[in-house]
Amino acid sequence: MTISDHPETEPKWWKEATIYQIYPASFKDSNNDGWGDLKGITSKLQYIKDLGVDAIWVCPFYDSPQQDMGYDISNYEKVWPTYGTNEDCFELIDKTHKLGMKFITDLVINHCSTEHEWFKESRSSKTNPKRDWFFWRPPKGYDAEGKPIPPNNWKSFFGGSAWTFDETTNEFYLRLFASRQVDLNWENEDCRRAIFESAVGFWLDHGVDGFRIDTAGLYSKRPGLPDSPIFDKTSKLQHPNWGSHNGPRIHEYHQELHRFMKNRVKDGREIMTVGEVAHGSDNALYTSAARYEVSEVFSFTHVELGTSPFFRYNIVPFTLKQWKEAIASNFLFINGTDSWATTYIENHDQARSITRFADDSPKYRKISGKLLTLLECSLTGTLYVYQGQEIGQINFKEWPIEKYEDVDVKNNYEIIKKSFGKNSKEMKDFFKGIALLSRDHSRTPMPWTKDKPNAGFTGPDVKPWFFLNESFEQGINVEQESRDDDSVLNFWKRALQARKKYKELMIYGYDFQFIDLDSDQIFSFTKEYEDKTLFAALNFSGEEIEFSLPREGASLSFILGNYDDTDVSSRVLKPWEGRIYLVK
């Protein structure tokens, strides 16, 4: 195949961009109230620019009661006062642009907060004009104790039933996530129009360049909201994906949203969208340029490997081969199409990648963190880097339940305690699971300095909203890593420079082929672009190992590696060593 057979290589700013994700609560506190804020982000824009990224994606900063850290929005057009003002946000957008970067915001429109005015109206009576903007259903019946039975057997993503009973009108409302995070009914055209105008149009008018679309595969539910088939025989409640994911009108809705954005923007700027679709085989449909839906998607296959499909905190063993195939599934579908892909291994919903997929021991933390950097920077698709990932942040160690903040952890802890007891095997397994997999590992405050107690995130006399990961005392902080040429931070800068220099192969490379796929130590592959070939050899083990050449007699020209004192002509890789070559 030639370049003409690969429409996915058509250049776009959002394909070539490296996008830095910011979790505002934990990034930088500018006013010493213990919470990160928008002015804090603005104060660190030069740091972000110097890293070598091209855009920032800021997680929800909208007004919210914060049941789920801002993903429960009560007003799409207003900044949560703890984060600042609308003017602070407009200033952040403007200064981001002045530094030559794009600004992407989170679009959370599958659900809103029960504190949103739309829901307050809807719940007020069964005849309210906005009643049908949400999913209201009467009880299926009543149990022996007289308690109302939910309308179907769907389980919330956060545990328990996906339905909450509201005594105002004695009906249940659907909420696939937290109890006060109520699902919007996209079947209602007036509801869709209001969502587009308030959540999308308002921010397009103020200059945003794109949206990360939260839970983008959930807007079209299965008609009638029927009971799910029994997939998990250990539970009466069933995972909601069957009834809520990739429903019959999902692509129609995304095309409508795309048209709204295109018609709203009058200055010619190209808006990018990345849809969090999680699972399924529709990725090529979502991202086909000819279908006008979303620019690219986040798939969860590679980051959910090692977890149970029925309960995210049940640890399941997996092999390197399985992980290699899962990672490749993120971009193989675009080969020879007009679709596009993403590459990421961390975000605000995932634990730290070094702990999960490499080696966070003091001996190998840095070198294995750099190995993951090499892997990510060499993969096809738009690259995302999550705050703290660039300094090699790792999971915190052995925290008691009282230190966790995540509503998902708290809900499941209470469910397990009630069902099995505090000292049960199930509870012990749960603690092992959250130690490896909890979202809280990615949400601890950003360590800017080595200074105790708050590492420069907030003032030394301030109590931060969340505990810091103690790793800042072991050198995992921006201040010390900036001065250390051998740090993970400075390696990220070099790797991003290489990704730009070799963008044809690293970003747009096609015809991906595994080398030694069955190896449970070596992750190696080739990619092509016109007459050029990239070869990556990555050792995902603590032992020395020899790699295979991409073809017999191949001549290799070294691009980048994570060991400074290595013989790049040798085919033996040191523990957790990775190298990227051009094949001649």
Swiss-Prot record:
InterPro entries under this entry? Glyco_hydro_13_cat_dom, Glyco_hydro_b, Glycoside_hydrolase_SF, O16G_dom_2
The record places the active site at D214, E276
Cite the EC number: 3.2.1.20
Q: Where is this site: Transition state stabilizer?
A: D349
Q: Name one GO cellular component term.
A: plasma membrane
SUPFAM superfamilies, per the entry = (Trans)glycosidases (SSF51445), Glycosyl hydrolase domain (SSF51011)
In the record, biological process GO terms are: maltose catabolic process; sucrose catabolic process
Q: Does the keyword Coiled coil apply?
A: no
Annotated CDD domains:
AmyAc_SI_OligoGlu_DGase
A GO molecular-function descriptor: oligo-1,6-glucosidase activity
Q: What reactions does this protein catalyze?
A: Hydrolysis of terminal, non-reducing (1->4)-linked alpha-D-glucose residues with release of alpha-D-glucose
Provide the leader sequence positions: none
Q: Which keywords fit this entry according to its UniProt record?
A: Glycosidase, Hydrolase, Maltose metabolism
Further facts: Present with 4030 molecules/cell in log phase SD medium.
Q: Which family does it belong to?
A: Belongs to the glycosyl hydrolase 13 family.
What is the recorded name of this protein?
Answer: Alpha-glucosidase MAL32
